[in-house]
Amino acid sequence: MEVRMDTRFWGPSGWRLLHLVAFAAPTLNKRYLLQFFQNLPYVLPCKFCRASLTEYYASDPIPTDTKEFANWLYRIHNRVNGKLREQKLITGKDPTWHNVKQRYEKWMKQSCTQQAMIGWDFLYSVAYTTPCSDVTSTPIPGAPLHPATPELKNRWNTMTIAERLPKLKLWWESLPHILPFPVWKKAWLKAVPHVPKLACGRKAVTEWLYHAEKAMCQELEENAPHDSFDGLCNELNTFSSGCSKIKTTKVKTCRAKKTLKRKSLDRNRTRKYFATGGFL
């Protein structure tokens, strides 16, 4: 069975990192920036999110001018929020562009001592959903028999492992080069000298990222969010979702059932959230 992650687990973490990257875009290596965003729809840890982002890219393509990335991602984020509102999963209004711009530009100006590495929940969710050789993709209901392009295959979740792994490899390769703060990039390139061995499966990739997190946090002289690899795996398993088994067109977002175990982890994560400055 495909493993997918609850969007409430990785979404906030992912959006914060992506928006920071978008605001830093004019200062980043354009080749890696494009490589990162071009492969993003293929690596998201929820098949419905991959499908939606593929559609959003088609109607609002990645800009060629790096100065336009911040506003482009703001529009993409609002499209996602619109989908969630239609599903009655959120009710709030979209923030104004002025408020978003003000918030992230202020963050970009913070000193190095205030720039704790963020995005780990998102990165771990990508790692934990690395496709394995013994798992086949479950097409989204309504999928055509033979989608002709990578975009259509991604839209309908019919990509083979051989087709998806190269996308993941390119994405992981680009990651350190598009980190929004120079201190993060320098620490990652020093502490994490290679990309994960994707063919070894999700456990190996997750373990690689766990060691990367430890090395990064040591390099940045900050506390690591996770105390042990077993504890991390327990947390990821608790927030994994069964959306791969869904055979209806009504559900369009991966969500895990709430359990006592998850509620307990939520409380622990909340404490860590504030201990790390509000970002995981």
Language-model region placement:
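Mid-to-C-terminal functional-domain signal that highlights helix-capping/loop sites
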Residues: 1-43, 47-280
